[in-house]
């Protein structure tokens, strides 16, 4: 764990075969990271590297999705094995794999694929990653003892639905298995996309830039902590900086909250570890409320922003997944 006192974890939002055999080991051994996440966009980039060329060329014309799952689950299993000691010691050690984003509107298919991927990898420290559009899928997987990463979280309403789903799934699991380790849940709050979308508008209205994502994340953090599920934590995602005047590790340093996780791109992690960082105080609920009232007063409809970002995020994941299918 990066900061034991604050119970702040840093996870790596990148997986690639050669990286797993080299730099990943160093980050893990030096207690810089203690978890990892993946998504279709990450695998799209990874599979274009030379590490996979021979495997793809000798795949005997497998169906693209079958080949994708072979490559992805191999990488996830390698990652899970490397972090098994962390997991056994209660120091996170989780790695996430996402279900096919094309299934986001099909609860039954999402559940089926989540169970299948979990069984295929067959490691206790794997989290099944599900876009937060299907609450029943989250609760069903957790009830079966499968840890879940609820992703593409933008709005407080999404968070409330996720928390209820995790509560239901946890209760169902606990009723069947007494005195066993509870499956874990993380709620992946996307951060930087708010500012990439709104900074220009904010600047034009003489409002502070680089703040909407932070304040929204802080608001959601309060919701999760107040709900009080011991097996569920806040995970801050989309924390890389693309252009602009912000330093590369801005969204990691600003969101070092107690009992939280930040999953960051490799370049962001490299920037972050150059200088010592300390845990941050979370903005008060009153300050958060005042901030969003100012936004509302300036005719920025945050609810429309929530919907747009979720829609865009789903489209991006589907596009990346479909691009992988074409390339394989």
Q: Where are the model-predicted features located?
A:
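N- or domain-start disorder-to-order transition segments that initiate the globular core
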Residues: 1-23
């Amino acid at each position: 764990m990066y900061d034991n006192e604050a119970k702040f974890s840093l996870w790596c939002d990148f997986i690639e075969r050669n990286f797993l055999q080299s730099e990943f080991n160093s980050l893990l051994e030096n207690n810089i990271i203690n978890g990892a996440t993946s998504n279709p966009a990450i695998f799209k980039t990874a599979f274009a590297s030379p590490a996979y060329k021979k495997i793809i060329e000798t795949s005997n014309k497998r169906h693209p999705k079958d080949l994708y799952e072979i490559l992805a689950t191999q990488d996830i299993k390698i990652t899970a094995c490397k972090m098994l000691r962390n997991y056994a010691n209660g120091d996170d050690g989780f790695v996430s794999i996402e279900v096919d984003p094309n299934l986001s509107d099909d609860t039954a298919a999402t559940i089926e694929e989540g169970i299948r991927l979990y069984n295929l990898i067959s490691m206790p420290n794997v989290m099944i990653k599900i876009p937060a559009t299907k609450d029943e899928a989250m609760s069903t997987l957790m009830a079966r003892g499968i840890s879940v990463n609820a992703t593409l979280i933008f709005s407080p309403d999404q968070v409330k639905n996720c928390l209820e789903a995790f509560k239901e799934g946890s209760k169902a699991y606990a009723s069947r298995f007494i005195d066993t380790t509870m499956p874990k849940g993380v709620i992946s709050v996307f951060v930087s996309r708010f500012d990439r979308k709104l900074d220009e508008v904010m600047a034009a209205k003489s409002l502070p830039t680089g703040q909407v994502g932070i304040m929204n994340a802080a608001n959601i953090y309060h919701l999760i902590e107040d709900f009080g599920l011991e097996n569920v934590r806040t995970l801050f995602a989309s924390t890389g900086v693309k252009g602009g005047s912000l330093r590369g590790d801005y969204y990691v340093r600003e969101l070092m909250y107690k009992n939280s996780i930040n999953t960051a791109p490799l370049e962001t992690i490299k920037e972050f570890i150059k200088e010592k960082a300390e845990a941050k105080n979370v903005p008060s609920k009153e300050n958060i409320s005042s901030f969003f009232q100012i936004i509302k007063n300036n005719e920025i409809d945050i609810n429309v922003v929530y919907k747009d970002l979720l829609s865009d995020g789903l489209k991006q994941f589907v596009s990346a997944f479909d691009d992988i299918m074409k390339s394989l």
